[in-house]
Amino acid sequence: MAESFVVAKDLHKSFDGLKAVGGVSFTIYKGEIFGLLGPNGAGKTTTIRMLSTVLEPDRGDITIGGYSVLRNGDEARRLIGVCPQDLALYEDLSALDNLIFFGRMEGLDSKAARSQAMGNLELVGLEERAKEKVAKFSGGMKRRINLAIALMGRPQLLFLDEPTVGIDPQSRNNIFDTIEGLQKQGMTVLYTTHYMEEADRLCERVAIVDGGQIIALDTPHQLKSQIGSPDKVTLEDVFLNKTGRSLRD
């Protein structure tokens, strides 16, 4: 039986009386790529922020690697790497110095931070640009640096929040290849996106999210099988079937 690594139970979060997440529950298994698929404003980012200890839920519980996020937040946090939707970079620093800085923030000594930084830059295909300032990089390259930073400290669980928004095909494919390679090494991944084709390619299971709630959860194949032939139906069709509107509305 697969080992549970992330367990979210009945998560609720509101801001100024407006519900952002209402009763979300799911389990992510160790070594799985699990997707949250939904339009902007569906509650995906709020869910990740609760899971990563940035926000405390109004109600509900989260367990990561056996640790309760609410009661053992420091222990849970050490297992997590977060690649946020917004770029978290120092543009006046080089790619290498960015990674070293964030590695030191993770508690690595100087030698370990430099070693991991070079390894992560190679992983995302930017080792030859290590000494260049990030300000000179394209949007796609900055996204790849964002991912490399999230891997500093060698987390067991990686949160990726819309990591391919607005980037070029080469960088998108590099990010996909990197994620798939990390999974082969045992990494557990939570991937949020509003691009159905990304969820279909990468994720073993997908939770379709709308209005702060999960409206369907299964493998992409099974979700598509619910409404037609999996070879002819897309996850966009599934979303339309469940909500009556397009995923991109």
Where are these regions (language model features)?
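Conserved ABC transporter NBD signature motif
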Residues: 60-71, 75-76
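Conserved ABC ATPase "signature" region
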Residues: 100, 104, 111-129
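Conserved catalytic motifs of ABC-family nucleotide-binding domains
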Residues: 154
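Catalytic Walker B motif of ABC-type/P-loop ATPase nucleotide-binding domains
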Residues: 158-161
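ABC ATPase "signature
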Residues: 217-218
